[in-house]
UniProtKB/Swiss-Prot annotation:
Lineage: Bacteria, Bacillati, Actinomycetota, Actinomycetes, Micrococcales
Function: The UvrABC repair system catalyzes the recognition and processing of DNA lesions. UvrC both incises the 5' and 3' sides of the lesion. The N-terminal half is responsible for the 3' incision and the C-terminal half is responsible for the 5' incision.
Species, as recorded: Beutenbergia cavernae (strain ATCC BAA-8 / DSM 12333 / CCUG 43141 / JCM 11478 / NBRC 16432 / NCIMB 13614 / HKI 0122)
GO biological process, one term: SOS response
A matching Pfam family: UvrC_RNaseH
A GO MF term: DNA binding
Protein name from the UniProt record: UvrABC system protein C
Biased composition (Low complexity): 672-693
Domain annotation GIY-YIG: ranges: 16-95
Keyword Cytoplasm: yes
Gene Ontology cellular component annotations, sorted alphabetically: cytoplasm; excinuclease repair complex
Location(s), subcellular: Cytoplasm
Amino acid sequence: MADPTTYRPRPGEIPDAPGVYRFRDPHGRVVYVGKAKSLRSRLSSYFQDLSALHPRTQQMVTTASSVEWTVVGTEVEALQLEYSWIKEFDPRFNVKYRDDKSYPYLAVTMGEEVPRVQVMRGAKRKGTRYFGPYGHAWAIRETVDLLLRVFPVRTCSSGVYKRAAASGRPCLLGYIDKCSAPCVGRISVEDHRDLAEDFCSFMAGESGVFLRRLESEMAAASAELDFERAARVRDDINALRRVVEKNAVVLADGTDADVFALAADELEVSVQVFHVRGGRVRGQRGWVTERVEDLDDGALVERLLQQVYGPYATEKGPDGGATGVPREVLVPALPDDAVELAEWLSTLRGSRVSLRIPQRGEKRALAETVRTNAQQALALHKTRRAGDLTSRSRALSELQEELGLAESPLRIECYDISTLQGTHQVGSMVVFEDGLARKSEYRQFVVRGADGQGARDDTEAMHEVITRRFRRYLAQRDVGVAGGGSGEVPAEDDDGVAIAGPVDPETGRPARFAYPPNLVVVDGGPPQVAAAQRALDELGVSDVALVGLAKRLEEVWLPGEEYPLVLPRASEGLYLLQRVRDEAHRFAITHHRKRRGKSMTRSTLDDVPGLGPSRQAALLQAFGSVRRIRAATPEEIAAVPGFGRRTAEQVLAALAPSPDDATTEPGAVGEPGTADGAAADPDGRDAVVVPEG
């Protein structure tokens, strides 16, 4: 690991000008490429105190052993050079948007003497027009089959074409009029090229021109009483309309745009793009890539556009512009140098390109659709990855190795605290066994605090939750000692709950908190880890590993360590920790919202013994408000259906003002330690089982 100070340039050596820079490792390989409006300002930021840098940046500057730069004239030139270097050197610390599969395109080989329509994948070839990409090859074949009625362009391979030309007989498509058969001279090479140009124009979105022309031909044939020809043209029109219908009309005719969307977490980014040509979605593609750089959405968009449109720099259409660059590029966020990026795209296209965020109307609605697709793709990717047995096994092995554990963490417990300005504090405990969520083992805690009014902060709350969980585990483990050594008298924990041992004697199932975890994960950094470790130390628990995950998941904190442990971005172990932390956060938030919502809908009538929801509703319907109920006489309340004299007196007694009202916690719900949705436990147990799924 290199020391950045050993290769730090002197401030006076770095020019205060736009440019592109490269970090190299000791072997001379480029590990990172970046651009800057001011090289001096940007490069100086890499050589500040290591602890102030993002962990991923820390890893990059300590991997590198030298830095070099190139000054350019404008920021647009910097953008172009940065893309070229990323493509050339493939640096490991740069975000790379790579398709997870090769998407098929509808291709027309206009570079050949006799153009051919076909399905193509992989690298694009010079002189070939591409339309798409499509999600499936069969979708292209269906489209081509419909279009060949109107544009009977050659679709055969070179070998088939040459054999047909040598024999003087066309292939089957030539006999059924789905090929104009230039191989046997039915149509000249020039006329066939015009046919291929019309095919490309239709696919590029100029469908209205051809539909109007065919409608005129059909009307003319009908006027001449040539009904057979009119019927053929009618069928051609229907075929073209079916092709148009396959591409839903989403925007105004003539709209030429690519619509991008991102869905990201701390480790991965899901990208989706819809290609709109002539107001219709002509193609769609998406992929999920690793988030190897600490970039915001704007910077991610910049990297994305560079890699999507960069290859078009060497592909020029007949007018000198890149045919794959649309007039509009709609993105979810604008990068800092959006003006320069739009200028670069305009240079590629050969005409002005608009780069913007859609704000309203149909384009905004389409952008939301693309974003939904990106979110679903990311969720599907995570689900498939989580369900893979090999990946789970690798994750557990990596955690064992990286954390220095004696054995694989087959049981992982993660704890999170949720609160709103110090109120309704709740803690959650989620359990993963063998890399999978064990929802029947989840637990919820209502944080009490030393005075019963809640903890002062989340570190105190974390200490309380960890203490309560492991105190119960120790009590169950040592039930014989806790019961006086004889085992005949059941032990009780500090809440007065009977402890019968690790196995429930009535059901034969494992008791709550019966199993200790191999690894405890807390949501937070050093303060939360220290609080949890203090709780374990106070209880004498020394055989349970502990780590903390800060909000940025690559920061894995160990007790007593000054710096976090940085796991590789592609690590299955890090991915498992992310899932565990996210699940604990979701579970805590859900419990917190329920508890807060319940307190907001609480009625004074809830305190009346034996008064359920239906009888409360009957009272409120009869009197209109609690104030009027309090002012009523026992006889008036007893007159309400379902009430008697005794119940009426209980209602009035419960509603009578009490000196203790002023000290009652506003909105308090249930007994301490009782989770939402459950009646107050008469045993006062400190957590409740909330099975899910």
